[in-house]
């Protein structure tokens, strides 16, 4: 079934708003067994909307449209839909009743401007909207049933689930299945080389690469009838990818790390400098983290490192705050202060200033202290301040996960 998506709004084309609606629609259609063949974005211009609807209506069997159903003068979608369908706008008493009831719950009376939301193409079918003022509607344009919904994401998502998808699902073939493998610490070119020949030529399993910095996602897709081949391919990729694979599908690094920490029975403390609490935020984002996470210190200044972590001032003076020696002292100090089994520290130069020839912007030291040792490693990351901080946070989580996995699989340490 040929399905298209039409997004309407000046704000989408000016870069003011990211079109999350189109992504959500495509994902839900895929899960239901459909696939978006074409996606257009047009401004709040009646002529542009009519042209887009006419074009998509001639080439599709279903068109899902979002945006332009509000009460303001630039909301022109209903008018354009009527023109493209060869009909007129008329006052929908059902839509007007919905507007009046909605207004009574919120403000007590309907604003005159909202009445124009009840002007809909003659003969259209209505799509209920329990969360907002704008009802959706369905009209036939060319060869396609066109489903119109408001651009407000939470309203659109509810209408998609309750009305649009149930109607379309019966017209789709067998559903698609997907496996997402999430990788870190390896480049796309290296992945391609590692996976060469993993999926036999002629296989009906599709493989796509998706970069979501600092992660790389490998997305395997196949129809429901090819589920065994999909699982076989996923198993082969897991075997080849090894430690680069940190999570799958909806699982995040945080979730996998939380599971390992719970299984280990170890407690953790943090000492962060350049990441400013980002690592602690990721760890505590998982419910139940209080079972293993004791405390986090953001010791941004040298004085804080000394006061909170007992890092000796002469050590900082001799080696600098961004150094292996100070990272080690931070981790050891954090572990002693918290009374934890483990302590992870980070100190670095996120930029844009502060770099030197010896320690350029992007220089980061991580340290992990346990009962018997303290491991320290230097990293040199590229990018602006946000990217350096982001990849530092992710590297720290991955580093800790690797430690826990090694401990789990080493006899006598698990």
From Swiss-Prot:
**InterPro entries cross-referenced by the UniProt entry:** CinA (IPR050101), CinA-like_C (IPR036653), CinA_C (IPR008136), CinA_KH (IPR041424), Competence-induced_CinA (IPR008135), MoaB/Mog-like_dom_sf (IPR036425), MoaB/Mog_dom (IPR001453)
The record, for Gene3D superfamilies, names:
3.30.70.2860, CinA-like, MoaB/Mog-like domain
Q: Which domain of life is it from?
A: Bacteria
Q: Which residues form a coiled coil?
A: none
**What protein family is recorded?**
Belongs to the CinA family.
Matching entries from PANTHER family are given as: NICOTINAMIDE-NUCLEOTIDE AMIDOHYDROLASE PNCC, NMN AMIDOHYDROLASE-LIKE PROTEIN YFAY
The family database entries (NCBIfam families) matched by this protein are listed as: cinA_nterm (TIGR00200), PncC_domain (TIGR00199), PRK00549.1 (NF001813)
Protein's name according to its UniProt entry:
CinA-like protein
The species is Geobacter sp. (strain M21)
